[in-house]
């Protein structure tokens, strides 16, 4: 089901709406103020105001779950600062988004919302947002996504042994867990005083939840230092292999609705809530796919062979085979695919989409033993002989791939959050709005150590 336009748009822009200072200044009132200086960039007050409005629009009808305006503004400003820092780091790493890529992304957003790009522009104008600002925000979101991808490719790996261990553990428990968390962050190398302050704060938050004065999502929105605080701390469905080992045993023993903690982790103190649990094997029936065994002969098109010459050559080869020549022997003699020529063109068993849609359609349309007409792909001109087909259960293979992906996701989340803390801790930040306004830019502490985070709740801490 397609989300309503306002939901998709708000989700996109709520926090990651980083606006070009020039474009924003042109569309704002006579003068736009600076909310924060971030290294060599700035967060404008208009950006901050727009992002706060977008967050509030997501909580329409649930305003009581949001913190006071000054606290919400601080949280949103910290998110905008993180986005600026990531975009700056990506720029220094050579990560770019072309206008063509940006246009495709915006067209996709419009399509998801059941409208055209022109319709999207009209909707943005009605909501008071300039199209140039919107393009800048989408560009920055894509850049941040690519920075994460680059980080994952360079730093995250999953071994076969880790997959085996996770599968064994999954078979033993057979459960998935819907979790939410609240993080009271601590900087790396926190002092005893910082640890004590964090402990007092997390105890106070836990007391509010236990007494029923705040439900867990509202407490997360108000107090959590986690990047998903404004989503109520929702972590979604996780299997045990996606949960840090320090918490996995604890969660296994919890019942839905229970809140555990405070727990001390690498990033600070955490409260965990088990929202729901379900059988991980539910609906885990076999997944059968058709695989094909085929041989092919390839004639390439290139500097030494024109399109017409290649087509004439493949026609001649096919005529020889139809006339009685052995396909395998002919492939060894004439095919220009060096990977399969030595095996008589044999490609082994493969699903239909393994070599692209055009090749797959040819194989699917043949009877066993039949030879195709010549057809063109990006590689050149082919003929293919289908040898056989079979039904294969790929559920085990898919399960391994899924587990490998979930382990990688967990590692990426842990490592990237640490990376963001380092990035934030090294940043040159000066606040120019709210109660943190100052006149001297300084190297800002990590977000978790920010002195202007919400004060501990008034409830007496409980242990």
Curated annotation (Swiss-Prot):
Keyword Endoplasmic reticulum: no
Region annotation Disordered: where it falls in the sequence: 329-348, 434-463
Compartments in which it is found: Periplasm
First-listed, main subcellular location of the protein, grouped into a coarse class: periplasm
Segments forming domain PpiC: 174-276, 289-388
GO biological process: Gram-negative-bacterium-type cell outer membrane assembly; protein folding; protein stabilization
Enzyme Commission number: 5.2.1.8
Swiss-Prot/TrEMBL domain comment: The PPIase activity resides only in the second parvulin domain. The N-terminal region and the C-terminal tail are necessary and sufficient for the chaperone activity of SurA. The PPIase activity is dispensable for SurA to function as a chaperone. The N-terminal region and the C-terminal tail are also required for porin recognition.
Protein name: Chaperone SurA
Source species: Xanthomonas oryzae pv. oryzae (strain KACC10331 / KXO85)
């Amino acid at each position: 089901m397609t989300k309503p336009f306002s939901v998709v748009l708000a989700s996109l822009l709520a926090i990651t709406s980083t606006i070009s200072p020039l474009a924003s200044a042109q569309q704002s009132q006579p003068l736009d103020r600076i909310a924060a200086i971030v290294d060599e960039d700035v967060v404008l007050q208009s950006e901050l105001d727009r992002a706060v409005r977008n967050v509030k629009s997501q909580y329409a009808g649930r305003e009581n779950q949001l913190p006071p305006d000054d606290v919400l503004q601080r949280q949103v400003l910290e998110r905008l600062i993180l986005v600026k820092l990531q975009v700056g780091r990506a720029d220094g790493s050579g990560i770019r988004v072309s206008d063509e890529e940006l246009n495709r992304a915006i067209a996709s957003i419009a399509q998801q919302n059941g409208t055209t790009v022109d319709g999207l522009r009209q909707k943005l104008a009605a909501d008071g947002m300039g199209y140039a600002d919107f393009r800048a925000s989408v560009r920055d979101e894509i850049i941040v996504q690519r920075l994460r991808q680059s980080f994952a490719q360079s730093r995250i790996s999953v071994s076969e042994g880790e997959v085996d261990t996770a599968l064994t553990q999954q078979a033993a428990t057979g459960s998935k867990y819907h979790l939410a968390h609240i993080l009271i962050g601590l900087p790396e190398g926190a002092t005893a005083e910082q640890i004590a302050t964090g402990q007092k704060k997390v105890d106070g938050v836990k007391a509010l939840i236990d007494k029923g004065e705040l439900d867990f999502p509202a407490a997360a929105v108000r107090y959590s230092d986690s990047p998903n605080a404004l989503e109520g701390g929702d972590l979604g469905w996780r299997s045990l292999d996606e949960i840090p080992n320090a918490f996995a045993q604890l969660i296994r023993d919890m019942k839905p609705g229970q809140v555990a903690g405070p727990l001390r982790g690498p990033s600070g103190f955490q409260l965990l809530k088990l929202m729901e649990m379900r059988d991980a094997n539910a609906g885990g029936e076999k997944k059968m796919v058709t695989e094909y065994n085929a041989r092919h002969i390839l004639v390439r098109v290139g500097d030494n062979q024109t399109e017409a010459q290649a087509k004439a050559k493949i026609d001649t080869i096919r005529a020889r085979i139809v006339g009685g020549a052995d396909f395998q022997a002919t492939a060894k003699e004439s095919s220009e695919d060096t990977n399969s020529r030595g095996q008589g063109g044999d490609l082994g068993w493969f699903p239909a989409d393994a070599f692209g849609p055009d090749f797959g359609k040819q194989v699917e349309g043949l009877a066993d033993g039949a030879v195709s007409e010549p057809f063109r792909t990006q590689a050149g001109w082919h003929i293919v002989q289908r040898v056989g087909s079979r039904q294969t259960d790929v559920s085990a293979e898919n399960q391994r791939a899924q587990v490998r992906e979930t382990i990688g996701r967990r590692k990426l989340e842990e490592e990237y959050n640490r990376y963001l803390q380092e990035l934030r801790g090294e940043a040159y930040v000066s606040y120019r709005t709210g109660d943190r306004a100052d006149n001297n830019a300084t190297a800002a502490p990590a977000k978790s150590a920010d002195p202007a985070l919400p004060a501990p709740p008034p409830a007496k801490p409980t242990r």
